Amino acid sequence: MSVISATNREKIFDPESGELLHEVIRPLSMTSSITTVRREDFSDPSEFLQAAIIEIPPNHSFAPHVHLERERTFTNLRAQETWVVMSGRVEVTFYTDKGVLISKAILEAGDLSISFKGGHGYKTMTSDALVYEFKSGPYEGQEIDKVFIKID
């Protein structure tokens, strides 16, 4: 069984504020011999959406557990979104909160994008494009969740 042994991370910042808006993560290499659990976190602990990659050796188990319900307070919470490309190719465009295009990337199988802030758009490039999408909720409808960026 092959596992990911390293990742290539492209962080995309707001050119005005320097704030991290988006990230593209790609697997770099694969190895068939892993002996210990290794974890690479992609999100700052303060972000609502947490993402990581975990390398797991054969026959390793994680103890069954339940995550505790607790009161949390978030202010000015926006939806954060991740796309994981399972097959095919997808072009992703990244924007600032003001709708300024700041970067583009081609995602292939195994790649993922995270949008913490700012805007994004996706365009499939192959007929076999299949993605997983994860976003923070609760989802209250398009009218409340997003505003579309005008593209010239």
Regions found by a protein language model. Name each.
Residues 121-152:
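Double-stranded beta-helix
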Residues 1-57, 151:
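A short, N-terminal "cap"/entry segment at the start of jelly-roll beta-barrel domains
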Residues 53-78:
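Conserved short histidine dyad/triad with adjacent acidic residue
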Residues 96-117:
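Short acidic-glycine-tyrosine-enriched beta hairpin
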Residues 52, 60-63, 88-94, 112:
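Short beta-strand segments in beta-sandwich/barrel cores
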Residues 64, 92-93, 113-115, 120-126, ...:
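Short beta-strand His + acidic residue motifs that chelate non-heme Fe in jelly-roll/DSBH
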Residues 57-58, 77-95:
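Glycine- and acidic-residue-biased ligand/ion/polar-headgroup-sensing regions
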